[in-house]
Amino acid sequence: MVGYVWAYQSLPLRYPSHFNFDGVPDGWTDKNLFSWFIIPAISLALLSFMYFITPLFRKYPQFINIPGKEKFLELSDERKEPVFKLAENLMGMIAIVEQLLFLYIQYAMWSAALSPGNMMPPHSTLIIIGHSVFVLGIVIFYLVKISDKID
């Protein structure tokens, strides 16, 4: 949070808040606490949601969305345990990657606000697309491992 406060103080009175695919600003906002801290607030809310929902997997396994759920629900508690651990690890990995994405988006907005031409850093689009591919890879990796444990 200290970094967000420090960055907020250095923002101009109006800064870019939305960018097109090429990193050119196409939306602007006035400097205010809400507009700057909404992204960290959403990030924290998402992290909190994932933190609190993950333990519910064990209490309400019928709500887990995994391949072979019917077979999973029929397993003994002992055989369900490795699946729960994998599902918890998956949620943890996604939470970490999403936090890093939100942090990067905030950094890119700050960087654009202070740069000539207000452009996002040139690698921003690649990072955001790469993030999506990486998350998809994580999900596939864990779902394959979960399927192996259920079979």
Predicted feature locations:
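Transmembrane helix-loop junctions in multipass membrane proteins, especially transporters and channels
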Residues: 8-13, 55-66, 110-117, 147-151
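Juxtamembrane inter-helical linkers in multi-pass membrane proteins
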Residues: 60-81
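Loop-to-transmembrane boundary segments
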Residues: 78-98
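Alpha-helical transmembrane segments and their membrane-interface junctions
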Residues: 93-113
